[in-house]
Design a protein with these regions (language model features):
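Glycine/small-residue-rich phosphate/adenosyl-binding loop
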Residues: 42-116
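Small-aliphatic-rich amphipathic alpha-helix that forms the alpha element of a beta-alpha
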Residues: 33, 101, 106-152
Length: 153
């Protein structure tokens, strides 16, 4: 696919098959993230790939723990793929994904969040090229900036 086809084809997918992606595909996705544009060309992103189901679920629960669903009530996303906004029965911010990649940047760096999203977008495009589903999930600070989240780091 060319880049335009990738951009037009990529979708946020919130339902996943019950199997891990191939290690080689994961490595390609991570490499795509690491070559993303970033502030000052510093290449500061650190990507942590989690393939342990129980740990993915635990981090996903931390991700959603402080999320105020009520603030977005009525912001319907999709009946085919309900989001945490639409469906209060969803207990993990990662929707049961078998692999989760967390993107970290320097604390107190003005462009860390922008850099992380550029990295994540490259990863999503690479996943699409490989025929894999993905969804960009925010709230990284809320997930790890607390005692249980910090303990996982």
């Amino acid at each position: 696919m060319d880049i335009f086809d990738l951009m037009w084809t990529r979708r946020s997918i919130r339902k996943y098959q019950d199997r891990q992606i191939e290690r080689g595909d994961l490595e390609k996705i991570i490499q795509a993230g690491l070559c993303a544009p970033n502030a000052g060309g510093g290449q500061r992103a650190i990507i942590v790939a989690v393939r342990n189901r129980a740990l993915c679920e635990k981090i996903g629960r931390l991700n959603i723990a402080k999320f105020n669903r009520n603030s977005l009530a009525g912001s319907y996303v999709s009946s085919e793929q309900p989001s945490i906004i639409d469906d209060p029965s969803i207990r993990s911010g990662f929707y049961g994904a078998p692999t989760v990649c967390a993107v970290f940047g320097p604390k107190n760096f003005l462009y860390s969040v922008a850099d992380a999203f550029c990295c994540a977008e490259n990863m999503a495009l690479a996943a699409t090229e490989l025929g894999l589903a993905s969804c960009l999930i925010a709230r990284g600070e809320e997930t790890f900036d607390n005692e249980p989240g910090a303990a996982l780091l």
